[in-house]
């Protein structure tokens, strides 16, 4: 099962890639539109979930949870309906990629930083900022140097990320973003010519881009 919030602006590329590969391997795969679907029956004794209207066209599927892998796409976190479906699959016993707590932690950059610190994973020094006083204090706590990185707490693919070269720009950019209600953090600038994205499990690299 793939939980995703499909809308007019999204072609759900990753979901379709997973579905295509499942079809090639003769594995049943169903994309569930969390904006349209609902759970019509949760049979704890049988270990099944009956999900109605999974595609907005009245399709109804019964999932046997012990044999169900549930992929969760980021759009599911945007509203309570998506979160409720995610929690229902997880609590009913489906194998989740990823769990609700894992998704919410990764969706918030400060929460992710705190998790890295707790598990002794090296990461650039980071501080939350909420007003001009906290801004200047945070800048000192992460080293007091320029340039520095300012980020919104949520966002992907570089959206909401700024490289700040001076104190004047630091205050100006923060004030501009606060006017729109943005939650912000400051992060130590690390100079590299390139970056690598990897998936690491138990010290072993499983994939990279």
Residue positions per predicted region:
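Structural detector of well-ordered beta-strand residues that form the stable sheet scaffold
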Residues: 96-97, 124, 149, 185-187, ...
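Short acidic/polar capping segments at secondary-structure boundaries
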Residues: 101-103, 130-135, 153-157, 167-169, ...
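Rossmann-like NAD(P)H-binding beta-loop-alpha module
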Residues: 122-145
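Phosphate-binding site of ATP-dependent enzymes
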Residues: 159-209
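Conserved N-proximal alpha/beta basic substrate-recognition cap immediately N-terminal to
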Residues: 6-125
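Generic beta-strand structural signal
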Residues: 98, 128, 200-201
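Short hydrophobic segments within beta-strands
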Residues: 3-5, 201
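ATP-grasp fold ATP-binding core
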Residues: 116-117, 142-159, 181-193
């Amino acid at each position: 099962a793939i939980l995703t919030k499909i809308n007019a602006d999204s072609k759900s590329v990753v979901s379709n890639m997973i579905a295509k590969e499942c079809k090639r391997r003769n594995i049943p795969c169903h994309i569930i539109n969390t904006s349209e679907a609902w759970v019509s029956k949760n049979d704890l004794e049988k270990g099944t979930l009956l999900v109605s209207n999974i595609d907005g066209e009245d399709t109804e599927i019964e999932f046997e949870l012990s044999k169900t892998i549930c992929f969760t796409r980021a759009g599911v976190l945007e509203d309570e309906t998506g979160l409720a479906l995610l929690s229902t699959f997880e609590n009913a016993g489906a194998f989740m990629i990823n769990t609700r707590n894992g998704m919410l932690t990764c969706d918030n950059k400060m929460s992710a930083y705190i998790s890295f610190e707790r598990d002794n994973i090296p990461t650039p020094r980071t501080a939350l900022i909420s007003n001009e006083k906290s801004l200047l204090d945070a800048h000192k706590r992460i080293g007091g140097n320029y340039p520095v990185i300012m980020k919104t707490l949520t966002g992907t693919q570089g959206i909401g990320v700024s490289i700040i070269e001076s104190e004047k720009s630091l205050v100006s950019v923060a004030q501009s973003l606060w006017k729109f209600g943005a939650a912000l953090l400051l992060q130590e600038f690390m100079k590299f010519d390139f970056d690598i994205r990897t998936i690491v499990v138990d010290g072993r690299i499983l994939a990279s881009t």
